[in-house]
């Protein structure tokens, strides 16, 4: 609880400033942990118009109740301000945040509150909440990204999906059986030649389900606005550093990259520290003896 409190209470703005919308039902906010490890970068959790200021990127994270949290943003003025800032500021939605950025959210099975509501309208996307929950580990690559984050094009992606819903590109005329995300791609030719998919060229990532090998397109982007269902999307390799580099170049500032390490390296260092602590606190010879005895 102390770590959550300190994370949410951070107010200082770094050379690169990332504002994460802290709705009442925020979830999976560890998606931004990788960015918190980079020097000169601030990750602030914002729940009011007054505190948003002028960030280099706005992130709409996951939500335990997308429709209720969107209604909360609509009522406190954050939605209107984010829509205004999206004209020249990068806005990135993950999972529930991605659903909010679209044109409509429909809940025919009363997964959340039932009914339907208008989205923020920043992405040509329509979401239908489903009764079945998607849970899967995925790997893949970014597609041909345009706009401010074009530097992510072709980069490797690794993460996971956990959501109730399917989102389609409402601006395309493609059969919804081949959803942008939320379902396996029916026509393998479309995987090989994504450029033949018309408006579906807006997809963020081409990802593969690590469990069954199925492939699909995930996410949508338009102008400065990007959305995806993939949690941990910035964790792979040096992707977070690439993102921060893009933000720095866009802002016209230079970061000290000498101290940067990949998030994978950072996590391994933490695991090593944990292992060292366990070894110092336990009689490891006794543990090994029990393991040897159990193996007999």
For every predicted segment, state its role.
Residues 63-159, 166:
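Cysteine-nucleophile active-site neighborhood
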